[in-house]
Amino acid sequence: MNNGSDGPTSAMGLFGGWAALERGYHAMTFDGPGQQAALFLQQLPFRHDWEAVLTPVVDAMVARPDVDPGRIALIGVSQAGYWVPRALAFEHRFAAAVADPGVVDVSTSWLEPLPGFMRAQLQDPSKKDAFDKEMGWTERFSRSTRATLHFRGEPYGVAGGSPFDLYQEVMRYRLGDEVKQVTTPLLITEPEDEQFWPGQSQALHDLLPGPRELVRFTAAEGASRHCEPMGLAVRDTRVFDWLDPHLRAGRVA
């Protein structure tokens, strides 16, 4: 189970861990680079090439006697909706996977609040000083913006430095042609009123060449918004109803 940008591993119990145990699965979660213990104790920042993280995780799992290497599933929540398909392009030992929600471009949630001229500045390295100056004025007049940039920037390894450099780093977190290499069956959630990456679940679904399914969640059933926080029972039921037959069949070699 792969967490997102800022949650503790304990939260993964709510986002599928307990439901997995109830169905007889074993469940494992971890802190990857930029996440909780890996960030605070080891000072390891995020990395966009998440296959470098998940491949060692799978190696550790298959070394255990209580793990069937042909029936390993992966659930990724929040920003892991980007990391999961990125890793699946290179790591093919999962029998099935879930992205909740699908994320094609992490940076859109950072870029959309900016005025157009500042987004244009980010496309031109010669405008770095101008961009940083604009952000400096924003941070001076808004303590909340300054605090948010520091909090959100720290996992990327560039907090407290140049805002231009921070945004450039976040803009690396975009899926490209590598998604054409994804062959693992993937379930993609699409919650109504997604706050951070609206429309990207459908976009990811349309990009993938292999078996995939888009599952929508609505406000009417109490399962709207990012990661369906008020409708976790509904979410878990659909996720594991989809995973069960894939894991019974096992990974196709």
Features from the language model and the residues they span:
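Conserved alpha/beta-hydrolase "acid-adjacent" motif
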Residues: 194-200
